[in-house]
Amino acid sequence: MTLMEDAKKGIVTPSIEAVAKAEGIDAETVRSCVAKGLIAIPKNNRRETLPIGIGKYMSTKINANVGTSRDCIDIDAEVEKAKAAEAFGAHAVMDLSTGGDLNEIRTRILKAVNIPVGTVPIYQAAASQKVVVEMTSDDMFNAVRKHAEQGVDFVTVHAGVNLNSLERLRQSDRIMNVVSRGGSFTLAWMLHNGEDNPFYAEFDYLLEIAKEYDMTLSLGDGMRPGCIADASDRPKFMEFITLGELVKRSRAANVQTFVEGPGHVPLNEIELSVRGMKELCDGAPLYLLGPLVTDIAPGFDHITGAIGGAVAGMYGTDFLCMVTPSEHLALPSLEDIKEGLFVTKLAAHTIDLIKEGPRERAWRQDTAMAYARRDLDWEKQFELAIDGDRARKIRDARKTESDACSMCGELCAVKIVKEAFGEKKAEE
């Protein structure tokens, strides 16, 4: 049985218990939400890994993308990135490799980390042929099965890219058309072969494979906007409608899902996108890359993504895909992964401060930091900081003889008031 089947039968599995304990909430609440598809716990039945809960009442989770490209094939480097991502606090990693021995890369990453691993099987299907459009539907489904057999916990499938959404795209005035790599492969295949997307047309077969391995489906946003000018258009919302229908079919088949969300969205349209997705997809967990809130920040897109992610979290985002400084520019380095992760962790924490479920725990962290700052307890501040090593290096780089920081020294407001209150109490 799948985890969702067990949950529907009232069974609190070890994975559900582990998630409930980690989140500090009642196991029955987690079970009920898994049964309804409001929480996903991506965990292939062929792989032992740390159960991670994504969705309602859960703390906001973070994914880190790693993987080779055809221009940069260094398997050892990508494995190290995956291990570093876990060490820096990622809750999942996705292997997006397109160059080299894809099976070897995936196998090594699966062995290297103890967190859920996701993939995009169509990348392997495309690599099986000289030209993307020459892959067959068998290539596509064989890739999904191969990944499932190897223990992949969740796969992105762009099943919402179909003939209907293609027609909406043709009628639109989009600047960037399609920027999803998997979405572009699917679109090109449909146009070349004159057929509908196999992942959509044969979705029931996809569900059979996913169910056999209890592999979660991440329903990809192949029509996500690639620039601010394309945000909130018909192709995007047409895909949301389709994905919502596929969520219902997945739940009926006892297959867990979460839904991927929009790429570039201005601040004032994020609420529309996120609430729209939640409504159209019946409360399924939402997995967002960003959204990026401006197009003019190459080199700083980890920041534009974190801004968008934090705002999106106000309206229901559950799972943030880390963006690195290399977005739109190059394959990310190990340092890019670290930088992107810490910025995304910051966004996730700001979401948790207001999210039902993790709110109390997040508030305790901030309150503890407030007391440490009041007491000028630097070691405690470094311990509580999202990146304590960085905080320590900055403080140590500009020394002061004061127990305050070098910005204010003896003129520190906290220090002055603390001493003033101390003198007043001594007089009393």
Curated annotation (Swiss-Prot):
Arranged from A to Z, the UniProt key words for this protein are:
4Fe-4S, Iron, Iron-sulfur, Lyase, Metal-binding, S-adenosyl-L-methionine, Thiamine biosynthesis, Zinc
What is one Pfam family matched by this protein? ThiC_Rad_SAM
State the coiled-coil residue ranges.
none
Q: Which cofactor does it need?
A: [4Fe-4S] cluster
The record's Gene3D superfamilies line, in alphabetical order, gives: 6.10.250.620, Radical SAM ThiC family, central domain
Q: What Enzyme Commission number(s) does the record list for this chain?
A: 4.1.99.17
Catalytic class of the enzyme: lyase
This protein's pathway? Cofactor biosynthesis; thiamine diphosphate biosynthesis
Binding positions (substrate): N65, M94, Y123, H158, S180, R181, G182, D221, G222, M223, R224, E260, Y287
Q: Which InterPro entries match?
A: ThiC, ThiC/Bza_core_dom, ThiC/BzaA/B
Q: Name one GO molecular function term.
A: 4 iron, 4 sulfur cluster binding
Do the record's keywords include Metal-binding?
yes
Superkingdom field: Archaea
Q: How is the cofactor bound?
A: Binds 1 [4Fe-4S] cluster per subunit. The cluster is coordinated with 3 cysteines and an exchangeable S-adenosyl-L-methionine.
Annotated binding of Zn(2+), by residue: H264, H328
Family indicated by similarity: Belongs to the ThiC family.
Query: Protein name, please?
Result: Phosphomethylpyrimidine synthase 1
Task: Give the species.
Answer: Methanosarcina acetivorans (strain ATCC 35395 / DSM 2834 / JCM 12185 / C2A)
State which gene encodes it. thiC1
